[in-house]
Amino acid sequence: MKIKTGVGILALSALTTMMISAPALAKIEEGKLVIWINGDKGYNGLAEVGKKFEQDTGIKVTVEHPDKLEEKFPQVAATGDGPDIIFWAHDRFGGYAQSGLLAEVTPDKAFQDKLYPFTWDAVRYNGKLIAYPIAVEALSLIYNKDLVPNPPKTWEEIPALDKELKVKGKSAIMFNLQEPYFTWPLIAADGGYAFKFENGKYDVKDVGVDNAGAKAGLTFLIDMIKNKNMSADTDYSIAEAAFNKGETAMTINGPWAWSNIDKSKVNYGVTLLPTFKGKPSKPFVGVLSAGINAASPNKELAKEFLENYLLTDQGLEAVNKDKPLGAVALKSFQEQLAKDPRIAATMDNAQKGEIMPNIPQMSAFWYAVRTAVINAASGRQTVDAALKDAQSRITK
């Protein structure tokens, strides 16, 4: 990744990562804004919003997209440097806030009401708001309209559909069974949850991985494997290839998968995930968020930029035109984007989902649930034993 700076183009090397406040990246200073955003996001569109801000206020805005910015930010912010504003998925922000690297943000009620309420929950840490929500990502059911014009509304219908499709040499559904991010929506549907969230805080001792609902969801998944409706070794690339070649009728994936499906010319739709036992599947929801560096001398300018320039229809449109944001937190712009049924479905699934907890204990959750699903799918452990082990690993 190359980063444009005032002194030409410097490739970030091992050396410059050691001295990150070297000329490779703009230093924090009063009277200008430096923003970091990942290279896969619409940074040129964000720079356009910055130009408008500069025209109106005279304050220069520099947008940078350093490699591994989520790792660099805590290193430089701890020394009182880095960007004024950082964009990243909300689940990393809890750790930053715990280390005192993010300023509390204080949007008034009128501004908060412009955004979907659940998106604010994603940027709350210990009861305080630590960032502004920008865009929303969640898994959806993606289906091949030529194979299933009317996709099933329930998980319980899928085995029979698979039987019908097998006669034609196809299968009903394939999705990544190796990562709990993809299997969790079914496990959580009937009452499983990661950590209990109450009063703006997560209770790390209240974990819902081996309750009756989680067991029911995982048992259904394992039964589908035992009955050969799915294969235990299916991973992301196997599932993606099968769907994009028209070999399977449905998959579970997010907005990042759409461009490859577009290229494959499959006639597809995006819709609500199926219900299980009459209850919605609960995907983890990721929220692209913008936090303000606690060391920034420009906190009021950062707030002005985020509230009155970026989080407006015009601001988000500029970023979205550069690289699609998917569903967005701002109600007025989401209403425009929702004319695309894929984006409407993403938001529907997100609103039924579970905000990805922004606490460090999630790394133990991912590891433990991944092991549990793989062990249960391969027959190494029963569902009950696998989830019991996962629960104790997460809470120990």
Swiss-Prot record:
Pfam families: SBP_bac_1. Its main location: periplasm. Residues 1-26 form the signal peptide. PROSITE patterns: SBP_BACTERIAL_1. Keywords: Periplasm, Signal, Sugar transport, Transport. InterPro entries: Maltose/Cyclodextrin-bd, SBP, SBP_1_CS. The keyword Transmembrane helix does not apply. GO terms for molecular function: carbohydrate transmembrane transporter activity; maltose binding. Belongs to the bacterial solute-binding protein 1 family. The complex is composed of two ATP-binding proteins (MalK), two transmembrane proteins (MalG and MalF) and a solute-binding protein (MalE). Part of the ABC transporter complex MalEFGK involved in maltose/maltodextrin import. Binds maltose and higher maltodextrins. This is Maltose/maltodextrin-binding periplasmic protein. It comes from Salmonella typhimurium (strain LT2 / SGSC1412 / ATCC 700720). The lineage of its organism: Bacteria, Pseudomonadati, Pseudomonadota, Gammaproteobacteria, Enterobacterales.
